[in-house]
Swiss-Prot record:
Membrane topology designation: Multi-pass membrane protein
Function: Phospholipid scramblase involved in autophagy and cytoplasm to vacuole transport (Cvt) vesicle formation. Cycles between the preautophagosomal structure/phagophore assembly site (PAS) and the cytoplasmic vesicle pool and supplies membrane for the growing autophagosome. Lipid scramblase activity plays a key role in preautophagosomal structure/phagophore assembly by distributing the phospholipids that arrive through ATG2 from the cytoplasmic to the luminal leaflet of the bilayer, thereby driving autophagosomal membrane expansion. Required for mitophagy.
Post-translational modification: Phosphorylated by ATG1. ATG1 phosphorylation is required for preautophagosome elongation.
Protein's recorded name: Autophagy-related protein 9
Family: Belongs to the ATG9 family.
Listed transmembrane segments: 249-269, 300-320, 469-489, 550-570
Pro residues composition bias: residue spans: 123-132
Stretches assigned to the Cytoplasmic side: 1-248, 321-395, 397-468, 571-651, 673-889
Catalytic reaction equation(s): a 1,2-diacyl-sn-glycero-3-phosphocholine(in) = a 1,2-diacyl-sn-glycero-3-phosphocholine(out); a 1,2-diacyl-sn-glycero-3-phospho-L-serine(in) = a 1,2-diacyl-sn-glycero-3-phospho-L-serine(out); a 1,2-diacyl-sn-glycero-3-phosphoethanolamine(in) = a 1,2-diacyl-sn-glycero-3-phosphoethanolamine(out); a 1,2-diacyl-sn-glycero-3-phospho-(1D-myo-inositol-3-phosphate)(in) = a 1,2-diacyl-sn-glycero-3-phospho-(1D-myo-inositol-3-phosphate)(out)
Lumenal compartment spans: 270-299, 490-549
Record organism: Pichia angusta
Superkingdom of origin organism: Eukaryota
Name of the gene encoding the protein in the UniProt record: ATG9
UniProt keyword annotation of Transmembrane present: yes
Length: 889
């Protein structure tokens, strides 16, 4: 009989306007009869008859005459009227005034106002099952729940970022459709209005819901899927409710401690009394009423720090309620406890979200009746690829900006020729660029995509850069003082206890954006860099530093000898020898501590003699984690130039701290003078590298992994004409998009291979003459394969693509995989399975299914790539010996 509104129990309690939760069961549809007659009249001209529906109208034997049809309508009305009176009498008998909307029936006769065409007949339908007892049962249940919870209804609804309910939600809810008026009551209208108001408040609040029902209600009423997924991912990376609370409380206490310690040490300590040595106790050096003597500049400094503290506390309080909702989402809907959250993989979480969406499609779509069509599509698209695009909508643009060197001219310091990017500058870039081109919902503004508004937008962005530069002039003094204190307190004790940390290295902020892949979530990227740090340090340390080692060994010998003498004299001398002053004001204890620290630093900085100098092997091993090995480095891995370029990416941590502090001073110059010059290039970048996807909105072109786009194809050869130059412009540098695609496949596992009968795009590309080199280059960069042929190198790795079809094995023989297992640590077993089968998982979504039929490639002849045999290097020699043994056997 058509698509009728399927009510749930909660929709019968709160009203159909809310329609909050999942469908209870198939029998619930029996009670959705408020629009029965309208639907009946709307569909009675349709033919042929449809299959029986759970909602049925009782009718007698089918008759083709108009008289019999009218009698059937009268019978239907009598049954409905009798049922209505039964419900009304039961509720009145129990002193319950309001009839739920889902139980309301039409008062008019079904044939009144009907425009049914003469000669048509009503489709037959089976008899209606008895529903009287069920109505009584649900009526009592609704009344019982309402009576038990009216006294405990919360006065306010928890507001959150993801699940924000409108403040006037209760006033927008429609009144109950039917209220029984007591004829004997004097104030009948007043009592009816009071009942209407109570029911409106009852439906507008969530106090009636259990934690599970509330979680389902919020899941079905998500209005901003980007923000919701960011909250879900933030809860995952924060390791659960307790860890997030402790972390944020700790951050607040650190700010409080720094503010208090700074104010106390700067104003409440008499340093003259302390340094003279006359003070013997704490009260002798404390200044009375010290805070009343604070200068105006100090008051401004503490006022800024106090404002930061207040903003952090406000942000913490606003997110506190959201954390509870996300906790219920994980614990109740996904079935993941906070303890398990610290060990479960993100791909498993994505799979659970996808299963939850599939099991609750109706509730998810019907939860918010005001959603647009695009919003409905967005809630249907929850594959791993779609979720990654939502979480990294802005980050993908940032990765592409550094990949295409859009900001390179502005961030290059004159006379230094070095990219200058720090965390503080990065924060200002996001504030000036991304907060300008994206709206409050996290979507790209339509004006950015209009070429006619290019100059106006560029002018506005130029003003934002200069305004930020002016503001940074006033904020720089306070920020410099704060960060000096913060870094001093953070690193001093670590360096004192472990002086070798002075020589520790870390990837710079510029390197992090340069090395990051498209759609690579932060925790996956951090894991990849952590695995590369040890090997990267080995690569740098193996370079000979003979002159430096000689100096360090000399200083270590002198300081170690002096410390040894002082320690021996301390043991043999009297008990006050440590207080003996070797120089004026400097005791033996001071020199033992100072010289001991110098000895430890020098000794830890001396290169070890047991390292083997093989920079190419080391750097290629690092490249399987960093996925970064420029063509310009080929054949020059042993040179100081390549080492210095790599050191700019993997710099000393102490230098990075100094650059962070220096950037606060240079920030006004970069923001006001350098960055405004690239405003037009930034606007052009967002317009030319954005693509709209139904259900996702505008995303970065490279993040969609589209390899077959005609207007923006992937190129592997140098540009020779204007068309090639244009295509080169629209292509990601360093084959980053292909590498990102392959790493994305590796990261999200190979569960549930999809049997679609369609060939993946990468597999099709691999058979094209111009594309095979591209994929091979990308995989060599992602693994331990040799990227350059013909270049002089000390180590050559045997794995090569022997077939144009990636469906065949990457390695020519299975024995080669076992032999070279230690050199392919960056490739998991799942990755090798991908490269052998290269089918796409249902977890990855439809973005990876591009539409050509699978072709039989088993009989394809080998092309020019078959001659890429690897015969050079030590490992190549081992491979040849291994093949020789096979021939002998």
């Amino acid at each position: 009989m058509g698509d009728l509104n399927k009510h749930t129990f909660l929709s019968r309690v709160f009203g159909s306007a809310s329609n909050p939760l999942l469908n209870d069961d198939n029998n619930d549809i029996e009670f959705s009869i408020n629009n029965l007659q309208d639907t009946f009249e709307e569909h009675q001209v349709e033919s042929p008859p449809r299959a029986p529906h759970p909602i049925n109208v009782n009718s007698e034997d089918e008759s083709s005459s108009e008289t019999e049809s009218a009698s059937n309508e009268d019978l239907l009305y009598d049954q409905k009227r009798e049922l209505y009176q039964q419900v009304e009498s039961e509720l009145r008998q129990d002193d319950y005034d309001t009839v739920p909307e889902s139980l309301m029936m039409e008062r008019r006769r079904p044939h009144e106002g009907s425009t049914r065409t003469i000669g048509t007949k009503i489709p037959p339908s089976p008899a209606e099952p008895p529903i009287g007892p069920n109505i009584t049962q649900w009526g009592e249940k609704a009344r019982g729940i309402a009576s038990r919870t009216l006294d405990n209804i919360p006065k306010t609804i928890a507001k959150g970022i993801s699940f924000q309910l409108p403040a006037n939600a209760s006033s927008k809810l429609p009144p109950p459709p039917l209220s029984y008026r007591r004829e004997t009551s004097v104030g009948g209208e007043t009592e009816m209005a009071q009942n209407i108001n109570e029911q409106r408040q009852l439906r507008g609040r969530l106090g009636l819901l259990s934690p599970m029902e509330r979680a389902l209600w919020l899941w079905s009423n998500v209005s901003n899927l980007d923000t919701f997924l960011e909250d879900v991912y933030g809860y995952y990376t924060g390791n659960g409710y307790r860890c997030i609370i402790l972390s944020r409380v700790s951050d607040l206490l650190i700010i409080v401690f720094v503010v208090w310690l700074t104010s106390f040490m700067g104003n409440c300590v008499d340093y003259n009394q302390l340094m003279n040595g006359n003070a013997t106790k704490y009260s002798d050096v404390v200044v009375d009423k010290c805070y009343s003597k604070i200068s105006l500049s100090q008051k401004l400094f503490f006022l800024v720090l106090f404002a930061i503290l207040v903003l952090r506390i406000k942000s913490f309080y606003s997110h506190f309620k959201d954390l509870k909702e996300i906790k219920n989402f994980y614990n109740l809907l996904l079935g993941v406890s906070d303890e398990e959250l610290q060990t479960i993989s993100w791909s498993t979480i994505v799979k659970k979200i996808k299963v939850l969406r599939d099991q609750n499609t109706n509730a998810l779509i019907s939860g918010n009746q005001n959603l647009r069509g695009d919003d409905l599509k967005s809630k249907k698209r929850l594959s791993a690829h779609d979720i990654a695009n939502r979480l990294m909508r802005k980050e993908n643009y940032m990765i592409a900006i550094f990949n295409k060197n859009v900001l390179a001219p502005a961030l290059t310091i004159p006379f230094i020729n070095h990219h200058f990017l720090t965390k503080t500058l990065e924060w200002n870039l996001k504030l000036c660029i991304f907060d300008f081109v994206f709206n409050t919902d996290g979507q790209l503004k339509q004006a950015v995509l209009s070429e006619h508004k290019r100059l106006a937008l560029a002018t506005e962005m130029r003003k934002r850069f200069r305004l930020a530069g002016i503001l940074s002039i006033f904020l720089t003094p306070f920020l410099v003082i704060y960060f000096l204190l913060y870094f001093f307190l953070k690193f001093f004790y670590d360096i004192k206890t472990n002086p070798s940390l002075v020589g520790s290295r870390e990837y710079s902020p510029y390197a992090r954006w340069k090395l990051r892949e498209f759609n690579e979530l932060p925790h996956m990227f951090d894991k990849r860099l952590k695995m590369s740090r040890a090997r990267a340090t080995e690569y740098i340390n193996q370079f000979p530093k003979e002159a430096t080692n000689i100096i360090l060994n000399f200083v270590a010998f002198v300081t170690g000898s002096l410390v040894t003498i002082l320690v021996v004299l301390t043991v043999l001398g009297h008990e006050n020898f440590l207080n003996f002053e070797l120089t004026e004001g400097r005791t033996v204890l001071f020199y033992i501590s100072t010289l001991g620290a110098v000895f430890t630093i020098c000794k830890g900085s001396v290169s070890e003699n047991d390292t083997v100098f093989d920079p190419e092997a080391s750097l290629r091993y690092v490249a399987q984690f960093t996925h970064y090995l420029p063509n310009s480095w080929n054949g020059r891995f042993h040179t100081e130039e390549v080492k210095n370029e790599f050191c700019k990416l993997f710099n000393l941590r102490l230098i990075l701290v100094l650059k962070e502090i220096t950037s606060l001073i240079m920030l006004p110059y970069i923001l006001y003078c350098r960055l405004p010059d690239v405003s037009e290039k930034v606007i052009d970048f967002f317009r030319e590298f954005s693509v709209h996807v139904d259900g996702l909105g505008y995303v970065c072109t490279f993040a969609m992994f589209e390899f077959d786009s005609k207007d923006k194809p992937v190129r592997s050869q140098a540009a020779n004409d204007d068309d090639d130059l244009k295509q080169e412009y629209y292509t990601a540098d360093d084959d980053k998009m292909v590498k990102s695609y392959l790493y994305f496949l590796e990261s999200y596992g190979n569960e549930s291979v999809r049997k679609t009968g369609k060939e993946p795009a990468v597999d099709r590309i691999s058979r094209r003459p111009g594309k095979k080199n591209l994929l091979r280059s990308a995989m060599m960069n992602n693994s331990m394969m040799d990227k350059s042929r013909g270049a002089q190198s000390t180590v050559r790795y045997p794995p090569q693509f022997r077939s144009p079809n990636l469906a065949e094995s990457v390695y020519t023989k299975r024995q080669n995989i076992d032999l070279m297992e230690d050199t392919t640590a960056g490739l998991s077993t799942d990755t090798r399975n991908y490269l052998q089968t290269l089918n796409n998982s249902t977890l990855l979504g439809e973005s990876f299914q591009h539409g050509f039929p699978v072709e039989d490639t088993t009989h394809h002849e080998e092309d020019a790539d078959s001659e890429d045999d690897d015969e050079a290097g030590v490992l190549g020699l081992i491979n040849q010996i291994y093949k020789h043994k096979e021939g002998v056997n």
